[in-house]
């Protein structure tokens, strides 16, 4: 007698485990999930990717406390000592020595006195610069007389030119053993004699070379990729136009030449906070993300924008749209921690987020 064939019974569902590598590829806001590599992440808050693993973000230790908002941390690197100052937005803006830490309140510049001179803008650009007389700080803020510090004493810096009101100097840089300064809302540059921290300056107007208009935004320095002994100084406009020079003396055609002229995305802010040195290169924060100046010289805008921050370019672009007008954008290199940090001010002087 034939028996009907039994239909196979389904077994119980079985789970399968699958291992994924740690997200060492970092945050990815560029690719779709289907095309994303398994080592990338769509959310990566307070985790830092390394070559082989991800590490949780470290906490922080309070170094100094004071009244007001710190708008510039100023570091003096002397021959024998390092000192830390904070430029504070308070009832009476001031620069305070925070080297020793703890509760600090005595102004070394500004304050209610004021000491040395009054400060109406605590947002400084500064450089460390050496002369035969020692190591100095040179500071400008586009609102007050420039300042200098010799490791012991703060004083007003005398930077003169017949066409210059020195309080209009908003950024500075060191190139070819000279101090360079930019005048706000112009394309006027001023430079001092070699190994000189103050005194009579020479004006260099480069406005006729910029085809997109605007005004000076940043002064950067970079070293040639093929010749490590060749340095360049680059001037960036508010429209993202870059003109680079090489040489040592702008007053001599034989020792000063235009080396490059190209377009990048507009810088997110003026002055030094938008850029930082990275080895022989210089990185600049723009509406296209963080770009390499050396790469920008040799590639087009789209190719360069896909480089350093290619995976988070959309996030940075969205942040520029939402927060671009706020003070607090900054690009900071942390060599000891092997990190490059982009600070985005989501609420001025009170909240921010950082891409690392």
Language-model region placement:
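N-terminal beta-propeller domains
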Residues: 1-108, 168-245, 328-330, 335-356
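Beta-sheet-dominated scaffold domains
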Residues: 10, 221-356
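Trp- and S/T/G-rich repeat-edge/linker motifs of beta-rich repeat architectures
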Residues: 44-69, 91-124, 144-166, 195-215, ...
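Helix-rich alpha-solenoid scaffolding regions
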Residues: 108-120, 132, 136-139, 276, ...
């Amino acid at each position: 007698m034939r028996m009907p064939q039994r239909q196979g019974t389904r077994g119980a569902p079985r789970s399968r485990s699958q291992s994924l590598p740690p997200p060492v590829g970092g945050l990815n806001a560029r690719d779709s999930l289907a095309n994303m590599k398994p080592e990338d992440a769509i959310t990566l808050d307070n985790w830092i990717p390394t070559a082989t693993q991800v590490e949780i973000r470290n906490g922080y230790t309070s170094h100094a406390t004071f009244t007001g908002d710190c708008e510039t941390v100023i570091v003096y690197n002397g021959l024998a000592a390092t000192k830390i100052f904070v430029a504070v937005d308070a009832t009476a803006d001031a620069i305070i020595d925070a080297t020793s830490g703890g509760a600090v309140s005595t102004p070394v510049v500004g304050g209610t006195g004021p000491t040395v001179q009054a400060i109406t803008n605590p947002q400084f650009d500064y450089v460390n610069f050496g002369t035969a007389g020692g190591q100095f700080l040179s500071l400008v803020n586009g609102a007050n007389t420039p300042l200098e510090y010799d490791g012991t004493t703060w004083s007003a810096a005398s930077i003169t030119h017949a066409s210059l009101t020195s309080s209009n100097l908003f950024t500075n840089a060191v190139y070819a053993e000279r101090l360079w300064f930019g005048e706000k809302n112009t394309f006027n540059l001023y430079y001092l004699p070699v190994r000189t921290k103050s005194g009579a300056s020479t004006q260099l107007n480069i406005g006729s070379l910029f085809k997109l208009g605007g005004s000076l935004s940043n002064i950067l320095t970079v070293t040639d990729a093929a010749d490590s002994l060749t340095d360049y100084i680059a001037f960036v406009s508010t429209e993202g136009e870059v003109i680079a020079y090489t040489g040592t003396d702008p007053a001599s055609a034989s020792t000063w030449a235009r080396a490059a002229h190209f377009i990048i995305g507009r810088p997110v802010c003026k002055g030094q906070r938008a850029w930082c040195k990275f080895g022989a290169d210089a990185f600049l924060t723009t509406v296209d993300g963080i770009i390499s100046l050396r790469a920008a010289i040799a590639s087009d805008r789209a190719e360069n924008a896909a480089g350093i921050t290619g995976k988070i370019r959309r996030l940075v672009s969205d942040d520029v749209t939402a927060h671009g007008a706020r003070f607090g954008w900054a690009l900071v290199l942390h060599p000891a921690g092997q990190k490059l940090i982009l600070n985005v001010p989501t609420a001025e002087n009170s909240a921010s987020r950082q891409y690392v």
